[in-house]
Amino acid sequence: MVRRLHRKAGQSLIGRQWPAVELVFGCYFDEDLPLLMQMRNTHPDLQLNHALPYGAIIHDRGVQFVVFSRHATEMRLLLYDDVAQREPSEVVYFDARTDRWGDIWSVFVPGIGAGQLYHFQASGPFDPGRGLRFDPNARLIDPFAKALAGNFQPATDGVIRPPKCVVVDDYFDWQGDRHLRHDLSESVIYELHVRGFTNHHSSQSRKPGTYLGVIDKIPYLKSLGVTAVELMPVHEFPTNNFDGTTDPRRNYWGYDPLAFFAPHRGYAADSRPGAQVQEFKEMVKALHSAGIEVILDVVFNHTCEGNERGPVLSFKGLENPVYYMLENDRRYYRNYSGCGNTVNGNHPIVREMIFHCLRHWVHNYHVDGFRFDLASILSRDRSGNLVPNPPLVEAIGEDPLLADTKIIAEAWDAAGAYQVGSFGDDRWAEWNGHYRDDVRRYWRGDPGMRGKLATRLAGSADLYQA
């Protein structure tokens, strides 16, 4: 049975007075919370004077849920007791008078904590001509969700039911683990796919296809002289169809993301909600203990929501024209990614989300670097034009909290941009596509490649000035 809860001003969700809380003035970000919790051995006090940070924030007495939507007319929080549940156990209505701060919706739910399952649901105009695609029936993934649970459920009634978001406690005993800070010029980076690297019986992994399985491969990586592993996408991505049917070949590599803050649940040995968070951290800690850094292949250029014919899963149903680049005819999506849509990375709201996401992975997961897929998209303004000194690229390179982090660009996109040799400033490294292509052509036996091979082996002076 669905219980519809509505908090009136001055009342709790269940009709009692709000518990006494200490009002803490100022602002903190979600990546600061683990340190705050360790310092105080508790969860931070409920912040009633502002709506930040985003996502699901655990407090001693409950959880605060914060989401951005400019054009929503109504926001709801759907709470579930079980991963397999098709309908929510509780529906919490945000009060636009007391739970909305500008374009931020924020509500506190007492009596729940880590492990709680949830979706957002937003009502608003369905007006594709203005780029608005609100669907009051859609179950929406929190853009800041730190873990997902379950799979897409069969849409027998026409309603897509995506994996549920999980409220996550960020605490983990790192036992003094820190970033390794290997010099990039001395790094040997091994690109691997978590499942593909460990799933075959020949890998001799005790937990094949998982983060924990990677730990069993550390002696092999050390024997190769590897100093860093670059993990192909581990941000949450769908592996079954949106209608709940399965396809083992769908999105195997993971380059069709669903939730940027959440490690992929399919790589966890333990299927319980949120277990992937702990297992990912165990993997990073073990790799660091062996002197091996962890670099993530991140796909901030598009999502699995696709174009105007794609499903409403998260961003589309919260604020479509902010999160995505749209054509002048705003019914349609600009497609610089070749995957149906393009994330609007230099919009201030989206830029902030990406910025917080990078900090989240560095500070909560201790990752050592990022390889940015189709990074030239990050150089496009909100109209899709390539611009000098793009705000997002500059912000990533200048962030003092990412100063020890390796940042590597795949400096092109699917719409003709090619910035190898000129992406960002000296803070950015690049994948050298010319090196890859010329070495392949040489080994294939193409004529006239000896000189080009020499140029690449000598450092590509035609691209990079000493």
Each model region followed by its residue ranges:
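The feature marks proteins involved in alpha-glucan
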Residues: 28-60, 87-91, 100-104, 108-191, ...
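Structural beta-strand segments of beta-rich domains
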Residues: 61-65
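Conserved alpha/beta catalytic core and glycan-binding cleft of carbohydrate-active enzymes
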Residues: 145-146, 366, 379-382, 387-466
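Beta-strand signatures of extracellular beta-sandwich domains
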Residues: 76-78
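Substrate-binding/active-site clefts of carbohydrate-active enzymes
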Residues: 193-212, 216-367, 371-398, 417
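Short proline/glycine-enriched turn/loop motifs at strand-loop junctions of beta-rich domains
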Residues: 69-74
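Core domains of carbohydrate- and sulfate-ester-processing enzymes
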Residues: 122-177, 239-256, 310-336, 446-466
